[in-house]
Amino acid sequence: MSTSRTPLSQQTPTAFGAPNPSLSDSAPVSAPTASTRPDRLSTVALVIFTSVYAFFFPLHLGHFLISEDAGPATGLALYIALFAVGCVAFRHPLARAAHQVAARKRRAVLTLIVGGLATLVIELIGGLASSALLNLAGLSGAILQNDASVAEVIQMFPPIIIIVVLGIVGPIVEEMFFRQFLIGLIERFAPTWVAVVVSSVLFGALHMHSFALSEVLSVIPHAFFGLSCGLLYVKTGRNLLYPASIHCLNNLSAFLPLLLH
């Protein structure tokens, strides 16, 4: 993986989280053109995407509108709809990311391999820390409610739906929100490392169903996984395709054994 020579904390993010190229002090500042500023369609789609996703998932406010019985099916449908809206909202950075990958295929494969191995190590560290803290708190064997809920959902729908929605669509939607959108947003007010850490903590909190100590400690591996994806996103020049691919592989590797059982 390659990094820019400019320190991350000194890079200026654009509206979609990609760093602006360096400008010399003597260069005249020109007004943004139609190709550099977000178009109206992207802006509207971004507002819809972030608002709907935040309402139903991180904030867990969907139960005010949807009955408990319809919750799982509605959640899967929302992921599909958000994926479509997100592709519109982030179509320009996604197109640039795809072009970068296509231009350097071997480098992209190597980046995925290194990124995947690094993610395994970071997630393992998070898992060990979680287990140690759970044992210290006398909560050994506690099961994260999110994992139990996912196991129930897997039994409710055909395998193809689980693979497509929870294995591919869902991870991409989460990467769009927590990496493409959230890191870029936080970078406007704080250094890049703060943006990565905060987005990772919030990603971990997404998997909590309560503030019980067992939930807080059990979600640590998820936060570490988010940290790995955030670092990969930043180190690859804000290319979302890398963390999204790692996220998809992570989910598929977890779901496939359950589907085959």
Task: Tell what function each PLM region has.
Residues 41-53, 141-145, 167, 178, ...:
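Membrane-associated alpha-helix detector
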Residues 1-38:
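Low-complexity, intrinsically disordered extramembrane tails and loops of integral membrane proteins
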Residues 54-59, 82-86, 118-127, 199, ...:
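Alpha-helical transmembrane segments of multipass membrane proteins
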Residues 40-57, 114-119, 196-198:
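Alpha-helical transmembrane segments
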Residues 68-70, 97-170, 188:
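Juxtamembrane helix-loop-helix connectors linking adjacent transmembrane helices
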Residues 156-261:
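Transmembrane helix-loop-helix hairpins at the membrane interface
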Residues 44-96, 143-148:
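Alpha-helical transmembrane segments in multi-pass membrane proteins
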Residues 91-96, 131, 135-140, 208-212, ...:
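Transmembrane helix-loop junctions in multipass membrane proteins, especially transporters and channels
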